[in-house]
Amino acid sequence: MSTSASASTSRSATAANREVKPLNGVDTPTLFATIDAVRNQPELAEFRFRATNQWLDGTHSRTTIEAFDGAGGTHSHRNNEVYAADHPAVLVGADHAPTPVEFLLHALASCLTAGIGNIAAARGVKLREVRSEIEGEIDLRGILGISDEVRNGYRKISVRFTLDGDAPAEKLKALVEQSTARSAVFDVLTRGLPVEIEVRA
């Protein structure tokens, strides 16, 4: 083989390697390595996420998320993430941003979707579309103090997924089932947890 032919073959192989993308955008070797590492060193599984919130005006506030602890160290996000929250005018706000309960819907939907992507990649299923519609029903008589018999939060949340991928419907549905079984946000919403409130004044 000539030198030019060898160089051409090398360039073609390099280009082909660059074109190979992880299935569903998930780095499965790292995913499996992480699972093995945590299995062997359970202390690596301990994480602490945190955020700071600042009141701006009325029902408008801003939350900043910068870093978290886990895997034996402290990690900074690539960008300091800032999220605003407010109430719409009908709820005596200025509608600068979504309401906190709408962010809760976002948290649940995005957590389930992330799980679906990871699980599909681990099972060798290529996804073409994952879309969800999520709704929460709430009776404001609770938070307005009108009735102690009405809970303050959502009484029901409904999620409808549409999936398209290289697998039969049963396997696609199984992805959602497994994601739900392992979702941190779903767990918090359906099982609850203690919340500690400290006040400094």
Where would I find each of the regions flagged by the language model?
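Alpha-helical metal-binding/catalytic segments enriched in His/Glu/Asp
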Residues: L108-L112
